[in-house]
């Protein structure tokens, strides 16, 4: 963080991927001491995993599921916000009304996915993490404007603000 703060440009956008990403991001930002830089912790990996589970349940192409927001850190306590997804012109509330599936299948599956991958493979999925990092960068640089809502933990005032970001909010004007 200190090196980025001292040598990085003032309009730098820093994406922290290594877990615990939110904590690492906070430490990096505090060490950087450059309030002009934008520090984000990646939540896109969990967002992509949640979209994958939903795409199977809804029989939809994963690319049709938009606005998947993850609240919290990459852990069993995170909350994938299925209610506010958009598929076509329908919200998650309209599409998913099976509360038992949400509570018994969807939430545990998404919340425990990282552990399941490690238990199965003996390591985390570097490819999935790399794709999620690329997806986050693309979302930050998107020209879709206000309709481009994506998930990231944005560091503000030395704390984590779990928020859904609009791409134009990550750009310095």
Specify the residue positions occupied by each region the protein language model found.
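Conserved small/polar residues in nucleotide/adenosyl-binding loops
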Residues: 163-172
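A generic signature of intrinsically disordered, low-complexity regions enriched in glycine/proline
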Residues: 26, 172-173
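Mobile gating loops/cap/lid regions near enzyme active sites that modulate substrate access
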Residues: 52-162
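Rossmann-like NAD(P)(H) cofactor-binding subdomain of soluble oxidoreductases
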Residues: 1-51
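Short, flexible active-site-adjacent loop segments at beta-strand->alpha-helix junctions, enriched
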Residues: 20-21, 74, 171
């Amino acid at each position: 963080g200190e090196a980025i703060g001292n040598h990085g440009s003032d309009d730098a956008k820093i994406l922290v991927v290594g877990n615990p990403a939110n904590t690492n991001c906070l430490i990096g930002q505090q060490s950087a001491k450059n309030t002009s830089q934008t520090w984000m912790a990646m939540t896109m990996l969990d967002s992509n995993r949640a979209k994958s589970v939903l795409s199977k349940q809804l029989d939809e192409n994963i690319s049709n599921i938009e606005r998947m927001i993850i609240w919290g850190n990459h852990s069993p306590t995170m909350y994938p916000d299925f209610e506010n997804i958009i598929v076509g012109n329908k919200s998650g509330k309209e599409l998913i009304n099976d509360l038992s599936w949400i509570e018994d299948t969807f939430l545990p599956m998404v919340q425990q996915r990282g552990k399941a991958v490690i238990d199965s493979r003996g390591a985390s999925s570097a490819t999935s993490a790399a794709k999620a990092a690329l997806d986050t960068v693309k979302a930050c640089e998107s020209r879709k404007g206000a309709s481009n809502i994506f998930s990231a933990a944005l560091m503000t005032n030395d704390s984590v603000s779990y928020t859904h970001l609009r791409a134009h909010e990550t750009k310095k004007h």
